[in-house]
Amino acid sequence: MTDFLIQNAKGILTGHEGAGARRYGDIRVIDGMIAEIGALEASPGEKIVDASGCVVTPGLINTHHHLFQSVMKAVPEGMNEELAKWLRLVPYRYWDRIDEEALRVSATIGLAELVLSGATTVSDHHYLYSPRYDFDPVELLFETAGQFGVRFVLCRGGATRGRTFDGDNTTPLPTETLDQMLQEVGKAARRWNDPAPNAMRRIVMAPTTPTFSLADGELKEIAACARGLGLRLHSHLSENTDYDLYTKERFGMRPVEWIAQHDWLGPDVWFAHLVTCDPEEVRMLHQSGAGMAHCPQENARLGSGVAPADMLAELGGAVSLAVDGAAGNEAADMITALYSAFTIHRAVKGAGALTAERALSWATAGGARVLGLDATGVIAPGKAADLVLFETHSPRYFGQHDPLIGPIVSGGEPKIRRSYVAGREIVRDGKIPWLDMEKLAADADRVVRRLAQT
């Protein structure tokens, strides 16, 4: 069903900021697109979706994740460690035990968690490509995402050199030559990449880091290859002071200055984290059009700090919201990410640092902007019908004078009456209709036991 009329909602949060942030009325969807908004009469035979007691928002857009980490939550050894040691004790410790079953189960867990929190678009930064694999991780991830019906952006990661840590006894991450990496990205792009503004599938060029994962001089070639293929660029940057120290010691400059010299700034580039950027780096990001995948919960959990997302947003820069891998936050859902952003910036900058409407815009319009999915991210005629109906009939929301912002400012596990991608229903009454949760729980337990025992 891609034609229907949503009626009786409490209100609509459009994904815009300012005067256009709210609308009231009905939403008509035709051929998976938003056709009209207002006081609308049902046409004869038109399907009606009753949104009584619901707030309607655009589908939420997660711009940075590592789905393979969804079976690595709450590993005791890594719970109280900062980034470098956590990497060694958790994802780098387990990566070589992630076989086809483990990746499929992990991706299913992560996608279910996201979809049940209102996500309709997921960008996953996957960087595990071992020659030992007898399966294709790219194909597996697209197939799994296809079951959920979400828009899926696969950021094809990888490294040409490994990273070692003090006291390292982990299996090194798999590496490949630069030619191998570029050939594999090109192959994936030819099969999966759709450049349309309402694409369901995208490929992005995404080396694991521009600093620790590549040999000097490779960044420019990677950027040129990506742009030649019509692909966007993504990576981690400035997640903590390790990045600052690395570029200062090796190149005598800060991370954003350094990547700017290697053609890694522009409106087709976005970075996860950017926690330690100084004001000049933020200005450079804004002027170039490069975007941020803001990961507030992950950065807080690992003690990395708070990214200057508010500073970039004030300049008019591209800020999006992301959950990052579940191994480093234990709750990789979009409502927790929204609530974390809303509260953390106020803790640092004061009560006026971030409004609910701006936080939502990062999770919707901002996500569409950094991913280049311009037909999504806001509720307006002519946009894709990626829509979420959040129920507010819960003690969590009772007593609120402004009922529209409840899903953002109250946190907690939401109840979604309906969720749509291009007008196709993916959630009904708080459930993913096709997904057997009991089986998924058993699969998760089996995989976790195997990871812990080997």
Residue ranges of each PLM-predicted region?
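Glycine-enriched alpha-helix->loop->beta-strand junction motifs that scaffold or abut catalytic
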Residues: 223, 227-232, 264-267, 284-293, ...
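Active-site microenvironment of metallo-dependent hydrolases
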Residues: 1-25, 30-33, 40, 361-454
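Alpha-helical scaffold segments that flank or form the walls of functional sites
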Residues: 74-125, 129-151, 183-198, 445-453
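His/Asp/Glu-enriched, well-ordered alpha-helical/loop segment
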Residues: 261-268, 310-394, 410-411
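Divalent metal-coordination and catalytic microenvironments
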Residues: 9, 27, 32, 53, ...
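Metal-coordinating catalytic core of metallo-dependent amide/deamination hydrolases
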Residues: 131-272, 280-282
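Active-site gating loops and adjacent loop-to-helix segments of metal-dependent hydrolytic enzymes
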Residues: 71-103, 161-178, 241-266, 288-291, ...
